[in-house]
Design a protein with these regions (language model features):
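Acidic donor-binding/catalytic loop of UDP-sugar-dependent glycosyltransferases
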Residues: 27-28, 75-88, 170
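Conserved donor NDP-sugar-binding/catalytic core segment of glycosyltransferases
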Residues: 79-112, 116, 185-186, 190
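Short, flexible, basic/aromatic active-site loop/helix in glycosyltransferases
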Residues: 99-105, 114-137, 152, 215
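Membrane-embedded multi-pass helical conduit in multi-pass membrane proteins
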Residues: 230-300
Length: 314
């Protein structure tokens, strides 16, 4: 939170307000917010833990501006962020928008590796704001903007526990509002600090994809099914390798592709090495969550659900 607020202080544009909503956190940031009250027009709100949707909706109700920007507390904002947002709105106004995320040079090698896998075309198909993409861009809540009036007309974030940002983005398009990517309005986004937390995150992302498909029929694309196909393919190849060692060649080739891409982008052999397990955790976790939710929701006809509920928000 300290880094997020410090980044907002350094913005060249100063005409904005900041609303911080504490969602029952075990590590309150009120003292941090107090340190910035003489440098930012800032409001601190606290509520019982109820998940990010309710917290964001509460925050927007307290806002007074024409546009509202949604940022995660683990983001760091570059100096030109608001300038880039304003320039894009002046050039081509729209009702909603979002920007990409990047890794900061100060991030740990693991965070850089996870950032690579979360943004690379070879692992996401470019749907998180990359220049190459297999599906249209949908803003995500770590870096999302919207006209306040549109946000309220849409009812804000839904009660989905995971995937609530994509749900809101879908409703933007379904209701005929304009939405686009602001490529220069990027943020530094801190990633999970260990593979266990990362696995939990991506499993829920896979589950959320099926939940989103149920809420918004017709939104499931080929790119969303690729991690599940990858997961099944890995299982088949590993089993086949017990009888034919050359079955491992496709996996080794993919690992080499990830290693080279991450090493070149981050200029670090260590990041390249860490990106290999990060990619397999990401695709495998998402694929398992996707398949699990497909079985429970599409075959067994159960309702919405999520995994690791007790720990995700702590």
């Amino acid at each position: 939170m300290d880094e997020l607020l410090a980044g907002l202080v350094n913005q060249k544009i100063k005409d904005f307000e900041v609303v911080i909503v504490e969602d029952g956190s075990q590590n309150p940031c009120k003292d941090v917010v107090e340190r910035y009250k003489d440098r930012l027009d800032i409001c601190y709100l606290w509520k019982e833990n109820g998940g990010p949707s309710a917290a964001r909706n509460m925050g927007v109700e307290a806002c007074h501006g024409e546009y509202v920007l949604i940022l995660d507390s683990d983001c760091v904002i570059p100096e030109g962020y608001l300038t880039a947002v304003e320039a894009e709105l002046d050039r081509e106004p729209c009702n909603a928008f979002g920007g990409p995320d990047r890794a900061n040079a100060a991030f740990t090698p693991l965070q850089k590796a996870v950032n690579y896998t979360m943004t690379s075309f070879f692992t996401t198909g470019g749907i998180r704001g990359g220049k190459k993409k297999l599906d249209k861009f949908y803003p995500r809540s770590f870096n999302m903007g919207m006209q306040t009036s549109v946000y309220k007309q849409l009812g804000g974030f839904s009660d989905m526990r995971f995937g609530e940002d994509i749900d809101l983005s879908y409703r933007v398009f379904e209701n005929g509002y304009s939405c686009r990517l602001f490529p220069d309005a990027w943020v530094w986004h801190k990633r999970r600090t260990d593979f266990r937390k990362f696995f939990r995150q991506v499993v829920n992302s896979g589950i959320a994809r099926i939940n989103l498909t149920k809420r918004h029929p017709g939104t499931l694309k080929l790119v969303h099914m690729l991690p599940a196909a990858f997961t099944l393919g890995v299982i088949v190849l590993l089993l086949a390798s017990l009888f034919w060692v050359y079955a491992l060649i496709p996996l080794l080739f993919y690992a080499l592709l990830i290693f080279c891409g991450a090493t070149i982008q981050e200029k670090s052999l260590l990041v390249g090495v860490l990106a290999i397990p990060a990619a397999f955790v990401q695709l495998g976790g998402y694929g398992l969550g996707f398949l699990w939710a497909w079985w429970r929701r599409c075959i067994m006809r159960e309702g919405e659900f999520g995994a690791f509920k007790k720990n995700f928000y702590k």
